[in-house]
Amino acid sequence: MPTPLSRRKFITQTSLTAVGLTFFSCAASKKSSAVVPGLQLGYSAITWGGNDAQAIKDIAALGFKGIQLRSNTVKDYGGNPQMLRDLLQQNRLELPMFSSGNANINTGDDAGVIASHVANAKFVKALGGKNIQLTNSSRPKTGSPTKEDLEKYGRLLTEIGKQTQALGVQSNYHNHMGQLGQTPEEVDIILGATDPAFVKLELDVAHYKQGGGDPAKAIYQYKDRLHALHLKDVRDNPAGNSGAYTFVELGQGRVDLPAVFKALRDIHYKGWGIVELDSVPSKDKTPVQCANITKDYLKSIGIMS
């Protein structure tokens, strides 16, 4: 028969074990609730400021499976896309998205705009990629765009999408501050004017947040159009700083990223989430240091191992 002392010891040990198990269970639950089984993680080369060869090596070493390149690579590798494709393969990186750039409705030469993106799509196909990202520089300098302009942009996107799809390359609209599609209402009009058979959505969660929207809500709303995401964070700048906001590493801003990942899980999302940081948020950081901050955050919520 146990003595009173051993009984107390047993009760104490049992209680501590229960507390430990509860803590572990809560921590595990917090991580598992964020996991999105169909999510593949990539990283954008934009932070490296055009040094794409270094970006490829660094992003691969960080453990990301894909990289987003930009149209500047056409200048560097357009004459020999196989060289770039070999570099991607050597580093075991896919090309889930390519920034094709500006689709401006105000050039007076829609055919030329379309042709430039079709040319980029051919380059992407030569690299083994299947997606291009489309933005615009069509927002008026003062005031808001008209519904007619937003719908015109949607029609232009559709024409680009028809021709790139014929090549086996998907066109994706990217919402963006300072462009047509800055606000959630504008995004909705643009998407409503596009043909979903030819244009998909690449949702940038930080731009959507900065434009006054709820990125998690957008994921539910556009689940049938959502083809890719920019995983991004943003913070407000203190008064007196240049600019109202700064894009920052994941977990360092005010985007509710756990809600974003929950929404992706809820809709059974299968596709790419591409981390993007336009530039280092402070001059004392390198692109790799910023990427490691983001990686640590993704590991802390169970998205990366």
Predicted regions and their residues:
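Histidine-acidic metal/acid-base catalytic patches
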Residues: 2-41, 49, 53-60, 184-199, ...
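Active-site acidic/histidine proton-transfer and metal-coordination neighborhood
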Residues: 14-16, 20-23, 107-201
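Acidic (Asp/Glu)-rich catalytic clusters
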Residues: 34-36, 56-61, 78-97, 118-129, ...
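Hydrophobic faces of well-ordered beta-strands that scaffold small-molecule active sites
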Residues: 39-44, 67-69, 95-100, 132-134, ...
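Acidic-and-aromatic substrate-binding clefts and catalytic sites of carbohydrate-active enzymes
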Residues: 46-53, 70-81, 103-113, 140-144, ...
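Conserved acetyl-CoA-binding loop of GNAT-fold acetyltransferases
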Residues: 64
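Short, basic, helix/turn surface patches
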Residues: 93-103, 122-130, 161, 200-207, ...
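Vicinal oxygen chelate
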Residues: 101, 137, 241-245
